[in-house]
A protein has these predicted regions:
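Minor-groove-contacting beta-hairpin "wing" of winged helix-turn-helix DNA-binding domains
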Residues: 358-362
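A short, conserved structural fragment
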Residues: 348-357
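C-terminal scaffold of the Radical SAM
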Residues: 3-5, 26-50, 56-333, 381
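Local cysteine-cluster metal-coordination motifs and their immediate loop/turn environment
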Residues: 13-26
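Short active-site neighborhood of thiol/selenol oxidoreductases, capturing the structured segment around
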Residues: 8-11
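Short, amphipathic alpha-helical interaction segments positioned at domain boundaries
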Residues: 364-382
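Short amphipathic alpha-helical interaction segments
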Residues: 333-345
């Protein structure tokens, strides 16, 4: 399905310190490397701005890493470049990720003055011991100050990241996290369960398992999240995301709804014209790129079956699920003709439900969403 709209993701890989659970493309760097990277990033933005001049950019997300680790002048340069070279819609949602302790009022005001209208704070926990074990370098008090400054700077759309099932966490401490943050009334809360990724310090930590909550407690934490946040006026619209009415993350909804997106910067992925491609993950390779169009030109278009997989796998993350009518419009055949067996089996097991035109995961299905969603992957091209 062709669309003239796209989303833009800008990757800033730099961090003051890498967290023990993090497997993202992020690291500490010298000033010289940061300067060289920002120069190359600007070059890439200008290249794609010319190539995609006819596209309407509906959301921008500056992520990382820790974008707020950069000087405010650096973020200003990035914003000026995108506004000059892309067609940014008037009502575009423009988000920047920030860590508490890496912003001040002046920096936050610069963000607002340059068109950034949404900020996402990576808090993870309000508990000192939990923050320390995660390798976070901020305190809850620093977060409160950063949050207050963001409001003073004029941010009317704030997200706070929280994490459950972390080392040393209890049901009581997690409930305390939820209530403390909900009382601050940010417009959006992302509540993720910790995943131990290979290659991280957590993965190598032999003592970690005994410090993690039990699987039973992890399930209780997940159920508790929705119950408590509902009390404070938040609605769950995706497996791990909650928002006040009208404040759902438009950028993330775009990913889950198959909106094309351009990713610029180190290791950034893109989905344009039914092609998926990505930039190098090695800094030296990225800085030596001669033509930013090569990855796009060399990428093959996704097959119809791969597009179907993504429609199901991504769309079913949303609590409202997916539309059977939209499936027909996209692919020219019914969802039942392709996935009838999987749908019937999942519904029989109580993992999925159908209401009118829409199919979605049940509460039980969400708890084992990865297993349920994998049923909609083809074993091979058919």
């Amino acid at each position: 399905m062709k669309t003239n709209t796209i989303e833009l993701y800008i990757h800033i890989p730099f961090c003051k310190s890498k967290c023990r659970y993090c497997d993202f493309c992020s690291f500490r760097a010298e000033e010289e490397t940061i300067h060289a990277y920002l120069g190359k990033l600007k070059e890439e933005l200008i290249f794609w701005g010319k190539k995609l001049a006819a596209r309407d950019v509906v959301t921008v997300f500056i992520g990382g890493g820790t974008p707020s680790y950069l000087r405010r002048e650096d973020i200003q340069m990035i914003c000026e470049t995108i506004f000059e070279h892309f067609h940014i819609c008037e009502d575009a949602e423009i988000t920047i990720e920030a860590n508490p302790g890496t912003v001040d009022l002046k920096k936050l005001c610069t963000y607002r003055e340059n068109g950034i209208n949404r900020i996402s704070f990576g808090l993870q926990s309000t508990v000192k011991e939990e923050l320390e074990y995660l390798g976070r370098i901020h305190t809850y008090e620093e977060f409160l100050q950063s949050f207050d400054w963001a409001r003073q700077a004029g941010f009317l759309n704030i997200n706070v990241d929280l994490m459950s099932a972390v080392p040393k966490q209890t049901l009581t401490s997690y409930e305390e996290n939820l209530r403390k943050i909900a009382k601050l009334s940010p417009e959006h809360i992302s509540a993720y369960s910790l995943i131990i990724e290979e290659g991280t310090p957590f993965y190598e930590d032999n003592k970690l398992e005994e410090l993690l909550p039990s699987e039973e407690d992890e399930v209780l934490m997940y159920r508790m999240t929705e119950k408590i946040l509902n009390e404070y006026g938040y609605d769950k619209y995706e497996i791990s995301n909650y928002a006040k009415p009208g404040f759902e993350s438009r950028h993330n909804l775009g990913y889950w709804s198959h909106i094309p997106y351009l990713g610029v910067g180190l290791n950034a992925s893109s989905y344009l014209d039914e092609k998926r491609f990505e930039n190098p993950s090695d800094m030296k390779d990225y800085l030596e790129i001669q033509s930013f169009g090569d990855a796009y030109e060399g990428a093959r278009s996704l097959s119809v079956y791969e597009q179907m997989e993504e429609f199901m796998f991504l769309g079913l993350r949303k609590t409202k699920g997916i539309s059977k009518k939209e499936f027909i419009e996209r692919f020219g055949c019914s969802m039942d003709s392709v996935y009838g067996k999987q749908l019937i089996e999942s519904m029989k097991q109580g993992m999925m439900k159908e209401e009118g035109d829409r199919v979605f995961l049940t509460q039980d299905g969400i708890l084992v969403s990865n297993q349920v969603l994998c049923e909609f992957l083809f074993d091979k091209e058919v």
